[in-house]
Design a protein with these regions (language model features):
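ABC family nucleotide-binding domain
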Residues: 1-200, 204-207
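Conserved beta-strand-loop-alpha-helix hinge in the C-terminal portion
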Residues: 203, 211-225
């Protein structure tokens, strides 16, 4: 897959013929220096942007022929997202924030019980009805992880999920994501600038100058680029 921005003299190749696959249940890190292309790569996997050449396949389904509306519905069903900032709506409760992805048009409503179950798993069972502006930064990121999981996605994509946290809270969030990956057999693809923070993971994919290193191909792939 290739991603080019601009044209002629202003052309920049953000990703240059990259290819890798991820198996169900893997915890994968995407690492690289600032500007290396790692966030661009995550955007391609997350169907937030389209490649100039090539395709992204999820669960064996090539997404390149989908319309914009179809991409939106497919993304809401198959993908969960966690970002550096939790971006919870302050006036809503923790539970209401977590339920938001299930209320997106074209996506079936997720049972209330499922959201409560996920919140219990991330350790927020006592915070369900508290306003989002009344919880700590670590709790907010736990709620963001629950929000990413509430639709039972095929993959959770996390972009610098610990980048806005102190070291102790960041380590707690790392352990929580690993716990969710193991308990739910959930695939996580995480962009980070600090691979050491995550310890042992299934695979590390390094992006440098738009190229991918240390990736490998396996059978029974869940994501193919």
């Amino acid at each position: 897959m290739t991603k080019i921005y601009g044209e002629a003299e202003t052309k920049v190749t953000a990703l240059d013929d990259v290819s890798f696959s991820v198996k169900k249940g893997e915890f994968v890190l995407i690492v690289g220096r600032s500007g290396s292309g790692k966030s661009t790569l995550l955007n391609m996997i997350g169907l937030l942007d389209k490649p100039t050449k090539g395709k992204v396949s999820i669960d064996g389904f090539a997404t390149s022929n989908l319309t914009d509306n179809e991409i939106s519905a497919f993304r809401n069903k198959k993908l969960g997202f966690v970002f550096q900032f939790a971006n919870l709506l302050a006036d809503l409760t923790v539970l209401e924030n977590v339920l938001l992805p299930s209320q997106i048009p074209l996506d079936p409503s997720i049972p209330f019980a499922n959201a409560k179950k996920i919140l219990e798993k991330v350790g927020l069972e006592d915070q369900l009805y508290k306003r989002a502006n009344k919880i700590s930064g670590g709790q907010a990121q736990r709620a963001a992880i629950a929000r990413g999981l509430v639709n039972n996605p095929t993959i959770v994509l996390a972009d610098e999920p610990t980048g806005n946290l102190d070291s102790v809270t960041a380590q707690n969030i790392v352990q929580l994501m690993k716990k969710m990956a193991k308990e739910l057999n959930q695939t996580f693809i995480v962009v980070t600038h600090d691979r050491r923070q995550f310890g042992d993971v299934d695979r590390i994919i390094t992006v440098k100058d738009g190229h991918v290193f240390e990736g490998e191909h396996m059978e029974q792939m869940e994501v193919t680029i």
